[in-house]
């Protein structure tokens, strides 16, 4: 071919330099990353082509096409998780693929001497920016770009570092356009098509850290393995030794979780909070809520401090008694009622926060809305209302397609009200909390008045829900929605039973209802009951499901069912005697309670028979009121 190896290499390098100049003019981080891939391909192709040298121009652009094809393939994968490394982030993608992105990390600091920070070897440069505090005061903030999180940890010990929520890693991914559980560099809003598994060992008492049997649920298919399973999925939640038999880019240990949501729920949290899943897998609900609120502040360039010092102002005792009342509860008249409706405000507390613009920085800031309690400012939308509004809308949409993900959003919305009054909340304030309970009581009282005005009988009311009896419920709901500006849902029950305590007082949080054969039982079956008692009550509810009216309930006979379970208490399986208390299994033995994990060592038959008898008598008492 008339070319020597050195001259050929020089020709290839010239073509690479041309391509590099073109990419530099475009100022694209993605193309710059692509150029590095092209150089790798060129080196590989050169090393394999010494015997038959390819034209330098063709070689470079062949490498470009090759790199583009690989990048496009990776863009089809979902970003499952991300970890910081020196000089960049490492992405873990679906189908066990990985990708490294070269970048720096932003660290926001309030300092009078930014130049001295540059002496740290991993601090590249800084930019001066204008931010403001929650009360609107403008502050000078320096954004340092660092090569690794080690530099960030060094700085936060010595400087006033702010904007640490969302995390530095989350901020880095956000500005790179990389969002968890989306396709690489994509903003699509569809739930990722990934494989999700739950793998747990089973012992005689149920789920265990160790066991000879393994229950494996992959997406919606459940199987049991009587030997060590081999599981390969994108995301797995696993318990104890089961984690040793799972291959996954995201592995969540169930025993470390601090939230009530499943792996699918954690994916939803990661998805909405733009936070890598490993940062929230073991977090509380409050942390996820705070991250979502912090993103609103961050995008508005409002400084997010480590701690917000808030001191409650001095008040008279009578003032505190007036505001500190909590939610409104109407005690029901015990008994059974046919043809009733349960009317619920959908996400009542979060909806009131959004409607009335309740946030730490809006309460007592100006007098746009005056109440007997506090005033609210409407000049700018509050951080908390903005953070909650789209979550309310998302929950409503998800309920139509995926109850599990909707439940994950529901937990955040439930926590949103309590965190308003939490002393360590970044965006909370006790006065804001008081405003919400005040408006909730006012709203429920007015709803009860409307019901009575329209001839409905109010049987029960608790915080955000009413049980009413009568006609024209549709018109009642329409009027309440129009007057309050809040959305209502309702269910029609064939019958409902309100119960009493053993002290003969109404039990507002416990009732049993039949909705066309589907049983709704609140406060009846408790988590800390023995398994045999839970099974008894579940069978009682199955009997109740056949009753179409209160009269039918009264005709039911459950004595035979009780006798069956009394005999089972004497001759039952060991698992019947297990009692779960705070995720620990116990059994009541002759000498007292012992941990089931130590092995089965007998049971106190009288304890279980007496427990069943008490519950049976409670059920009979309930039926006698029909």
From Swiss-Prot:
Enzyme Commission number, as recorded: 2.7.7.7
InterPro entries hit by this protein: DNA-dir_DNA_pol_B, DNA-dir_DNA_pol_B_multi_dom, DNA/RNA_pol_sf, DNA_pol_palm_dom_sf, DNA_pol_type-B
Sample GO molecular function, one term: DNA-directed DNA polymerase activity
One of the Pfam families matching this protein, by short name: DNA_pol_B
Catalytic activity entry: DNA(n) + a 2'-deoxyribonucleoside 5'-triphosphate = DNA(n+1) + diphosphate
GO biological process, one term: DNA-templated DNA replication
Enzyme class label: transferase
UniProt superkingdom: Archaea
Cystine residue pairs: none
Alphabetical UniProt keywords: DNA replication, DNA-binding, DNA-directed DNA polymerase, Nucleotidyltransferase, Transferase
UniProt record similarity statement: Belongs to the DNA polymerase type-B family.
Record function comment: This polymerase is devoid of exonuclease activity.
Protein name, UniProt field: DNA polymerase 2
Native organism: Saccharolobus solfataricus (strain ATCC 35092 / DSM 1617 / JCM 11322 / P2) (Sulfolobus solfataricus)
């Amino acid at each position: 071919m008339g070319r020597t190896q050195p001259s050929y290499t020089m020709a290839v390098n010239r073509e690479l330099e041309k391509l590099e100049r073109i990419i530099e003019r475009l100022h694209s981080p993605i193309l710059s990353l692509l150029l590095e891939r092209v150089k790798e391909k060129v080196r590989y192709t050169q090393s394999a082509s010494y015997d038959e040298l390819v034209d330098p121009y063709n070689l470079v652009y062949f490498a470009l096409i090759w790199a583009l094809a690989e990048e496009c393939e990776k863009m089809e994968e979902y970003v499952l998780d991300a970890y910081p490394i020196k000089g960049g982030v490492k992405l873990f993608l679906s189908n066990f693929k990985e990708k490294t992105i070269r970048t720096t990390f932003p660290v926001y600091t309030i300092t009078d001497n930014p130049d001295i920070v540059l002496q740290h070897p991993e601090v590249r440069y800084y930019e001066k920016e204008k931010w403001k505090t929650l009360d609107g005061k403008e502050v000078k903030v320096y954004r340092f770009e660092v090569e690794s999180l080690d530099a960030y940890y060094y700085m936060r010990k010595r400087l006033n570092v702010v904007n640490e929520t969302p995390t530095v890693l989350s901020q880095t991914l956000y500005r790179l356009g990389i969002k968890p559980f989306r396709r690489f560099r994509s903003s699509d809003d569809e739930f990722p098509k990934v494989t999700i598994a739950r793998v747990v060992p089973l012992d005689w008492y149920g789920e265990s850290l160790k066991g000879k049997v393994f229950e494996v649920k992959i997406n919606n298919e459940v199987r049991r393995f009587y030997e060590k399973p081999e599981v390969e999925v994108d995301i797995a939640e696993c318990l104890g030794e089961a984690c040793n038999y799972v291959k996954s880019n995201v592995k969540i240990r169930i025993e470390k979780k601090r939230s009530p949501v499943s792996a699918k729920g954690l994916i939803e949290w990661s998805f909405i909070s733009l936070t890598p899943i490993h940062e929230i897998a073991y977090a509380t609900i409050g942390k996820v809520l705070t991250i979502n609120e912090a993103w609103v502040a961050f995008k508005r360039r409002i400084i997010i401090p480590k701690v917000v010092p808030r001191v409650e102002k001095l008040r008279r005792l009578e003032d505190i008694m007036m505001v500190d009342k909590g939610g409104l509860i109407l005690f029901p008249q015990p008994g059974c009622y046919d043809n009733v409706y349960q009317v619920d405000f959908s996400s009542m507390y979060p909806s009131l926060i959004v409607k009335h613009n309740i946030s730490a920085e809006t309460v007592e800031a100006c007098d746009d809305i005056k109440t007997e309690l506090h005033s609210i400012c409407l000049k700018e939308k509050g951080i908390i209302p903005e953070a909650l509004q789209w979550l309310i809308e998302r929950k409503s949409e998800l309920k139509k397609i995926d109850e599990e993900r909707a439940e994950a959003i529901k937990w955040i919305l439930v926590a949103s009200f309590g965190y308003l009054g939490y002393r360590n909340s970044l965006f909370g304030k006790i006065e804001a909390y008081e405003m919400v309970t005040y408006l909730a009581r006012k709203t429920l009282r007015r709803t009860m008045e409307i019901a009575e005005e329209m001839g409905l009988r109010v049987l029960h009311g608790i915080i955000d829900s009413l049980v009413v009896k009568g006609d024209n419920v549709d018109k009642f709901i329409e009027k309440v929605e129009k007057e309050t500006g809040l959305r209502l849902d309702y269910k029609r029950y064939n019958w409902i039973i309100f119960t009493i305590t053993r002290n003969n007082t109404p039990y507002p949080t416990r009732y049993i209802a039949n909705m066309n054969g589907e049983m709704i039982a609140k406060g009846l079956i408790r988590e800390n009951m023995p398994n045999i008692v839970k099974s008894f009550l579940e069978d009682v509810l199955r009997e109740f499901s056949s009753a179409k009216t209160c009269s039918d309930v009264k005709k039911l006979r459950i004595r035979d069912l009780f006798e069956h379970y009394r005999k089972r208490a004497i001759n039952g399986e060991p698992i019947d005697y297990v009692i779960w208390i705070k995720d620990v299994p116990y059994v009541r033995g002759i000498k007292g309670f012992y941990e089931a994990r130590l092995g089965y060592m007998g049971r106190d038959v009288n304890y279980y028979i007496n427990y069943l008898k008490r519950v049976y008598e409670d059920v009979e008492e309930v039926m006698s009121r029909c």
